[in-house]
């Protein structure tokens, strides 16, 4: 069992992406460097920051960075622990997200997930590769997960 959120959990998601190249080929290649920020849901917890590199049909890098570090990414998906945990639990319960828990829905109004980017073209990469990101997170259905903020 892996704990969400943790480096090991996200590395497993990357490994699953790499094992399922054929599924990702359906959406076309994705060359993008991005980050995911887990914002604390209470003052007792600290933020977590993870960096991902997608090259063609694979995840070539997953790193945990210190919060506040310049992640050198195209964009960062920012949301609270509660938002991320609810999305992952929904994906696991339904073998994929219901309409209210898809990345498209959760980012549509910049709430509850905000897409932080330095410019519009970088932010647009999320939309361009949106199906790839959703399929990446759908890999959570194959991870036995313990949720701990």
Each model region followed by its residue ranges:
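Feature captures hydrophobic
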Residues: 1-149
């Amino acid at each position: 069992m892996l704990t969400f959120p943790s480096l090991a959990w996200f590395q497993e998601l990357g490994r699953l992406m790499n094992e399922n190249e054929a599924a990702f080929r359906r959406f076309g290649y994705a060359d993008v460097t991005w980050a995911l920020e887990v914002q604390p849901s209470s003052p007792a917890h600290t933020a977590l920051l993870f960096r991902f590199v997608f090259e063609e049909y694979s995840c070539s890098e997953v790193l945990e960075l210190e919060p506040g570090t310049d992640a050198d990414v195209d964009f960062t998906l920012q949301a609270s622990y509660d938002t991320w945990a609810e999305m992952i639990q929904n994906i696991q319960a339904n073998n994929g997200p219901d309409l209210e828990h898809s990345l498209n829905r959760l980012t549509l109004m910049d709430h509850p997930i905000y897409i932080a980017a330095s410019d519009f073209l970088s932010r647009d990469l999320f939309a361009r590769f949106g199906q790839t990101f959703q399929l990446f997170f759908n890999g959570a259905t194959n991870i036995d997960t313990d949720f701990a903020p």
